[in-house]
Amino acid sequence: EQHLLDVRDILYIDTVDKRTFLYTGKTVYECALRLYELEDGLQNLDFLRVGRSAIVNFRRIRSIRPELGGRLLLTMENGEQLYVSRQYAVAMKEKLREVERSILK
């Protein structure tokens, strides 16, 4: 069965055992595309890679908390928590600065 989703409804995307899943506020959908294929298509829509196996919708993050070791802990709108690895934390912090600059203009 195929579903048409509005990308704004997606909280995050992750991969488990080479299977890709899209998480909305209420439902989880399996997707035939690989994570890197989705990442390429969603780059300009505020989706950011947060680890080897996950991409988040920046607009659906409720809070961001720094953790030991340079990681970040994200709490999504539905209360689920995801870690941003050190490798991807730099891009997340840059996105935050970009948003702050646009607000202060």
Where are these regions (language model features)?
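C-terminal structural segments of small proteins and small subunits
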Residues: V90-A91
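Short, charged, intrinsically disordered terminal tails
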Residues: E94-K105
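Conserved binding/recognition cores within well-folded domains
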Residues: E1-E77, Q81-Y83
